[in-house]
């Protein structure tokens, strides 16, 4: 965790506990785990966007910080949607009905948890998001170690190439080169998740 406060420790412990339960089902760092967890994790940004829209609508955004947070959450959401599409669509990580059912139902629960928490205590919601991304970094670093060279050296999937070609994508803004293999795609995703850790830490003190 980038944020070193008591509340951040509590947030990280909560997410670690949830992660340990999910590890029972999705224990390998593969496309199945990545696709399922991205559905769940991305929902947190969707919920934050909804809550920020509401707070802005009722007139609480006097300094423009809520709008800035909303725009950042939308940018992060788009990036996480790309991750989901890479592993769920291109690599067929959600081919099992059970994975789709479980991931999507957990995502609905996560949506309401994050939406309500954002309305009540945005700092805590952002710290929970930071903790989620800390765990995501671990997952993708494991993927680089646990997946076979054959898997990592396969060509970069179409979604990854389309995302890189967007001028405002995180990969282009950061200066990443166009990925040629899945190894390079995963390396860029590790950087994405690390950037989300920092962004969520900053959002925790935004308003």
Q: Which residues fall in each region the model found?
A:
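Non-heme di-metal
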Residues: 1-207
């Amino acid at each position: 965790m980038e944020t070193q406060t008591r509340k951040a420790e509590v947030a990280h412990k909560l997410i670690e506990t949830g992660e340990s339960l999910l590890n029972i089902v999705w224990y390998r760092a593969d496309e199945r785990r990545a696709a399922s967890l991205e559905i769940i994790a991305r929902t947190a940004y969707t919920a934050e966007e909804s809550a920020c829209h509401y707070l802005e609508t009722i007139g609480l955004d006097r300094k423009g910080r809520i709008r800035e947070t909303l725009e950042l959450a939308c940018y992060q959401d788009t990036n996480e949607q790309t991750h989901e599409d890479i592993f769920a669509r291109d690599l067929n990580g959600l081919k099992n009905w059970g994975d789709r059912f479980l991931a999507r139902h957990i995502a609905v629960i996560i949506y309401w948890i994050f939406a309500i928490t954002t309305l009540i205590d945005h700092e805590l919601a952002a710290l929970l998001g930071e903790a989620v991304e800390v765990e995501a970094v671990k997952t993708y670093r494991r993927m680089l170690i646990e997946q076979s060279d054959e898997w990592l050296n396969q060509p970069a999937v179409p979604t990854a190439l389309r995302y890189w070609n967007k001028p405002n994508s995180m990969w282009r803004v950061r200066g990443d080169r166009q990925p040629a293999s899945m190894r390079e795609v995963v390396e860029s995703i590790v950087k994405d998740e690390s950037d989300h850790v920092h962004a969520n830490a900053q959002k925790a003190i935004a308003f």
